[in-house]
Amino acid sequence: MPSLGLVIGLSLFSFAAAAQVYPVSGVWAAIDSQFPTAANETCIAVKTFGVEAVSKKSVSEMIIFAKDKRYDVKGDVQTETTIKSIKLADGGFRITESFSKRGSWLGLRKKATYILKVLDPLTIEIWDAASMTRYAKCGSQRPPI
């Protein structure tokens, strides 16, 4: 009969292995017709001003994907969400997220579902119930060695 410690250790290991992560990572800036700068100019604004680029209206929206978390900055609003599920769908990924504890009201957690499509290594689209937004990846544009 296995020891209780071994059983607990194995169960914790299996939960860690089941953690889901986003299919993309890093900083992404929205490509928006009301902000008619080229994608590389948008990313320069993000590199120069960071999150302030959004509040200064140099960039309409910025998203940071980090493992199972997504940080979204739009105007003066910043949100943090965590993946609840990710599934292949419609040539992309159907992602369901829940908002962080700071976004909860009376212990209720709001969920969001959308489709994320990877168009190429530097461009993604996010389709939600109301609209589609295209994003350009900010960071080194050099291919890895």
Can you name each region flagged by the protein language model?
Residues 19-20:
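Boundary of Sec targeting at the N-terminus
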Residues 89-145:
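Beta-sheet ligand-binding and adhesion/scaffold domains
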Residues 24-68, 106-108:
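Short, solvent-exposed loop/hinge segments that bridge or flank secondary-structure elements
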Residues 1-9:
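Sec-dependent signal peptide recognition
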Residues 35, 76-78, 129-133:
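Short, solvent-exposed aromatic-acidic interface loops
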Residues 14-16:
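N-terminal signal peptide c-region/cleavage motif recognized by signal peptidases
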Residues 57-97:
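Central antiparallel beta-sheet cores of small beta-barrel/beta-sandwich binding domains
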